[in-house]
């Protein structure tokens, strides 16, 4: 087994078999979502986000940090490739909470071809991310551990939607065109540096739970969800409380001496 797989499996506490099949893909997808938190801390500090294999491994795996889509799906793609899955990254346009005009391609997701079927995997869309792969099939409701999703085909584009309290809400749209590393670098740079990017203005964290719940942090507001409903909400009174939640609830390996956040 390669070093990255040893380190990654230790990171997500995985001791199962690693056969190239849909059961392995589902299990790794959920384990990843429940262990490696979505977070944008480096954008706010600010620290440049590097997308090369070594940087992603050192940050998300060795240093026990999280990241956003370019990092999360970058690591997951590498792991699947090391396991000999047929996988490649795609780029999508986020339409959730965006104006009607089409935004640039700033979301990284994965296409996995397995057992003569195509699957979409995505461990990097924050609180609404998939926690299981779904088939690349149009207008089929597909259940994951954290809710129902569907894909709609519109010409060459696909639109991913999630069921939000019985209302279908679009998340992002994408096509199956081949992308290059430079495309991910460009999307990452835009997401981290565009003045209106929400990653530049809000601290965002999410970790999914194996029982179908999830934990979120938006600035100093912490929420615990079960079955899509908030069962605990609290405003953190100070930076010390924020640091504690980062470590205790999100398992974030952060050197607090290197982080400076203003009091609320």
Describe the function of each predicted region.
Residues 257-264:
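Residue-level detector of conserved catalytic or cofactor/ligand-binding positions
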Residues 154-251:
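Acidic/His-leaning functional-site neighborhoods
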Residues 1-64:
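Secondary-structure boundary elements
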Residues 11, 82, 248-249:
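Residues at alpha-helix termini
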Residues 4, 75, 241-242:
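Short Gly/charged-rich anion-binding patches and loops
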Residues 74, 78-144, 148:
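Hydrophobic/aromatic-rich core segments of domains that either
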């Amino acid at each position: 087994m390669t070093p990255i797989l040893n380190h990654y499996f230790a990171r997500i506490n995985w001791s199962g078999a690693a056969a190239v099949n849909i059961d392995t893909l589902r299990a790794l997808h959920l384990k990843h979502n429940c262990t490696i938190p979505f977070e944008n801390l480096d954008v706010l500090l600010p620290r440049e986000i590097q997308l090369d294999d070594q940087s992603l491994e050192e940050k998300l795996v060795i240093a026990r940090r999280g990241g956003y889509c370019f990092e999360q799906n970058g690591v997951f793609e590498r792991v699947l490739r090391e396991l000999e899955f047929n996988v490649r990254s795609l780029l999508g346009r986020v339409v959730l909470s965006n104006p009607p005009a089409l935004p640039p391609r700033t979301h990284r997701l994965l296409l996995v071809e397995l057992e003569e079927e195509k699957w979409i995997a995505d461990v990097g869309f924050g609180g609404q991310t998939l926690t299981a792969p779904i088939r690349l099939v149009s207008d089929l409701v597909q259940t994951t551990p954290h809710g129902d999703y569907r894909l709609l085909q519109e010409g060459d584009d696909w639109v991913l939607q999630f069921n939000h309290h019985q209302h279908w809400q679009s998340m992002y749209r994408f096509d199956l065109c081949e992308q290059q590393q430079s495309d991910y670098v460009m999307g990452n740079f835009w997401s981290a540096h565009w003045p209106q990017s929400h990653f530049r203005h809000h601290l965002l964290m999410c970790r999914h739970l194996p029982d179908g719940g999830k934990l979120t942090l938006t600035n100093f507001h912490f929420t615990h969800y079960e079955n899509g409903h908030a069962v605990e909400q609290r405003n953190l009174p100070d930076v010390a409380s924020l640091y504690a939640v980062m470590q205790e609830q999100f398992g974030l390996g952060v050197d607090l001496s290197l982080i400076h956040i203003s009091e609320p």
